[in-house]
Each structure stands twice: as structure tokens, then as C-alpha cells.
């Protein structure tokens, strides 16, 4: 059980008074029965899957939830970025009745103390209710009806020109490479193959810039883009539309929802999850790749130089070459 869940559980009596309690951004796998929620919302596909069997229709992987009855309380678990927290609060606030309590819980190392100040946008009486397990629990009462949530107002459009290819890229707070092209992705784009064909998968697509660039260089490919972050999928869809290309964009935890075999993979895979690091997803993705890729299909992967993916790629594919590198990043190439 995660620390934030432990703090919520030790304050379970506090939440027993609510008839319609909303949970936003629950931890993965942790049992939420003690909160008796009316609805649980997540922007993380893996979290959604971890609770789906237990919560069934109570949980939604969505940014379009419209409740039939306003909620009288909400619990928000602190996300990684403050921008994502702002979006989450703006998303749920219109679902709450005036006077409803908003709770924010998170770890101190995740910045809960400074993040709690975001609650002041919804009420002037925010207070710290608990401090334990290296976490804090804050509460505020909604003082006035919140304005309707407008997703488009959170999307920033960035013009990117790379190797004489112009693209418009959509970005939302909380999505990797928000507001600028990161150096790792740029290094992979600089060394992108120009003779790709068939189904090409962009794993951990983020805002969609890598996939869009790959499609621009290889217009005949059938591009597919996957991520577990709903905000990333929304950005990728917008990026594709603005770039005038076509792609199939859908949530998938690694290979789980990718049907059949693909003819190539391009990826700047994630290794952060929440406020920590998590390497297992990418390691498992590489290990499983041989079973999901067609014969002779290329894998092009960029990663920080300190990440030990080369040995896993070599063990899986029999060979791993370094296509390009800087002091911070390395592009690996392998063939099925």
C-alpha cells in the first residue's frame, strides 16, 4: 500500500460522512474500499486496469466525466507535476457542489507542501489535517461554483521545425517534453530511418512529435502510437491532426493492447512514473518485442546513457548497435 493511501486510511472516519465522494488520480492497485467512493477518475491507463475488476463502472479513464449529481467531497492524490495538478483540480471542481470538501494528499518529497497552495484557488480556508508517513493531507471547502472545464484552454500548440520538416505539436502540462523538443527525441529524429514500411509503432508516444516526424519522413507507413497517459494520447491525436497525417492512437500498457506484429518500433521510452523512476515497463517491452515484431523489423530506441538497455536489447535481438550518441543520450538500433 502506497504511503498516501496509508494516510487516507488512517483518516478513514473523515471520509465516512460523504454521500457522494469523488476520487481523482488513485494509486495503482491499492484497495479503496475504505473510502466508499461514488466515482473514481484516472488519467493513467495502467491504474485504470489495476482497479477495473474491483471497481467496475465506478472507475473511468476519461477527461469527459459528467456526473448526474454533484459530489459533496473529492480526494485528489498528488500527481507528479504541479501543472497536471492544476488541470485535475480544474477538471473536478465543476463536478462539486458549493461547500464540498476537496482533499489533497501526497508525499513530502513530491512537493505536497507547495502543491497545497493550489487549493487556495478554490477556497480561503485550506488547512493541513494530517502529517504522517512522510505525507501530508490537506483540505479546503469549495466557496463558489467553479467554471466549466475547457480542455482546449490547457492545450499549447508549439511550432517545431526539424530538418526542414515543419510540425505543429500539441502539449498539455504533465505530458513528457511539454513546451519544447527534448534532446533525446531530437537525437533519434536526427537519425531516423527513411525507408520504414508497414506498421510502425511509437511506444510511449508522449505529445506525438516522434511519431509525427517518423510519418512525415515515411509517409507510406501505418503509424500507431501508444501511451498509458490519457493527456499524452490527447496531445498525440491533436498533433497528428495539426500535422495533416493519419495515425492510430490508443492506450496500451506496453504491448498488451497492440494486436498482431508490427514492422518497426520507434521510441523514447519513459522511465519516470509519478515522482520516482521505473525501468521495468521498458525492459519488459524490449524483452517482449521479438514476439510482437515481424521478421527484419527495426527497433530504434533512444535513452539516457546511464540506462542499461543495451544488454537487454542484445540479449533479445542477438545484437545491439549504437546509431548515435551524445554525453547524455544514446540511440540504439536492432533488427528482429
Model-flagged regions — what are they?
Residues 1-56, 183-267:
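Conserved SAM/SAH cofactor-binding pocket of Class I
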Residues 62-69, 256-260:
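Short amphipathic alpha-helix with an adjacent loop that forms part of the alpha/beta core around
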Amino acid at each position: 500500500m502506497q504511503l498516501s493511501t496509508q494516510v487516507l486510511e488512517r483518516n478513514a472516519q473523515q471520509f465516512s460522512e460523504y454521500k457522494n465522494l469523488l476520487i481523482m488520480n488513485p494509486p495503482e492497485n491499492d484497495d479503496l474500499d475504505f473510502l466508499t467512493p461514488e466515482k473514481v477518475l484516472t488519467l493513467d491507463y495502467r491504474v485504470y486496469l489495476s482497479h477495473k475488476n474491483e471497481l467496475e463502472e465506478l472507475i473511468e479513464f476519461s477527461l469527459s466525466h459528467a456526473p448526474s449529481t454533484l459530489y459533496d467531497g473529492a480526494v485528489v492524490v498528488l500527481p507528479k507535476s504541479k501543472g497536471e495538478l492544476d488541470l485535475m483540480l480544474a477538471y473536478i471542481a465543476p463536478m462539486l457542489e458549493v461547500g464540498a470538501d476537496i482533499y489533497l494528499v501526497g508525499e513530502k518529497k513530491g512537493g505536497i507542501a507547495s502543491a497545497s497552495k493550489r487549493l487556495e484557488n478554490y477556497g480561503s480556508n485550506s488547512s493541513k489535517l494530517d502529517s504522517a508517513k512522510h505525507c501530508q493531507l490537506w483540505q479546503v471547502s469549495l466557496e463558489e461554483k467553479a467554471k466549466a472545464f475547457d480542455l482546449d484552454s490547457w492545450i499549447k500548440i508549439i511550432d517545431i521545425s526539424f530538418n526542414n520538416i515543419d510540425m505543429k505539436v500539441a502539449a498539455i502540462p504533465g505530458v513528457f517534453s511539454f513546451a519544447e523538443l527534448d534532446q533525446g527525441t531530437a537525437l533519434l529524429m536526427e537519425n531516423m530511418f527513411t525507408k520504414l514500411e508497414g506498421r510502425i509503432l511509437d511506444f510511449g508516444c508522449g505529445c506525438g512529435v516522434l511519431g509525427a516526424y517518423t510519418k512525415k519522413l515515411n509517409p507510406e507507413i501505418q503509424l500507431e502510437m501508444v501511451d498509458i497517459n490519457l493527456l499524452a494520447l490527447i496531445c498525440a491525436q491533436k498533433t497528428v491532426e495539426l500535422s495533416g497525417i493519419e495515425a492510430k492512437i490508443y492506450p496500451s500498457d506496453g504491448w498488451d493492447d497492440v494486436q498482431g506484429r508490427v514492422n518497426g518500433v520507434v521510441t523514447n521510452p519513459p522511465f519516470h512514473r509519478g515522482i520516482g523512476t521505473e525501468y521495468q515497463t521498458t525492459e519488459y517491452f524490449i524483452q517482449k518485442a521479438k514476439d510482437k515484431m515481424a521478421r527484419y523489423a527495426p527497433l530504434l530506441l533512444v535513452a539516457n546513457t546511464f540506462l542499461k538497455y543495451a544488454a537487454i536489447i542484445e540479449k533479445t535481438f542477438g545484437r545491439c548497435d549504437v546509431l548515435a550518441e551524445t554525453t547524455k543520450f544514446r540511440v540504439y538500433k536492432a533488427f528482429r
